[in-house]
């Protein structure tokens, strides 16, 4: 669980410290305030392995974080992300100590000043504003083979969307949520046996993603992540614009999904421009398990 982050000089995000709840954290930010960038920064650090091994050196941290920042933001060099001199400090519940790193404008690599001594299990999942259900399974291969102008988190998301279903049933709150998601879709999300693309099985017939609208495809992503265990207790979910392309019915389903994730022990970071959506999502969570962060 991420406890807090302190930022100075990172892109368009105002300097300051933000403390996070153990459950749902809704980042409410106007256009241009950097909400999406904050999600990608936190996800980059988590993916970098900064809290997954006690044997990593400061140089290893620096190389790993640099690589993830380059993939997530696609800058000319990592120093392009700094306003003069940038400093980031991140506290993690499971790791003892603080991860602190920084870099200056024009720098090729970050410099790690302090790192935690403990470990924190689990890998994050990032759900972007765009639906990616129709990008499986071809996008990760395209990303690796060619220099394409897409964020690295898209590749990561598509990779976990394509992961096989777990043999065990999801935890109780997630099992109930999965049933609700699949009822809304009219069937179970599965892979096409021939090309491994995602389909919805409705009354024995395979419905391709091209026959669903964008909002439904985003629900497909949620159902898939629960079914294959990529959203499970103890992990972290980064969720940009959860209600993008959704009507009021799906927006309520999104709020219910966030509450189920929190109940199952998932830490959720959601970014939105809408105070109304923040109210809806936070209102579904028990007191003390949700927070609103304004940028």
Regions found by a protein language model. Give the residues of each.
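Phosphate-coordinating catalytic segments in nucleotide- and nucleic-acid-processing enzymes
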Residues: 3-4, 45-234, 288
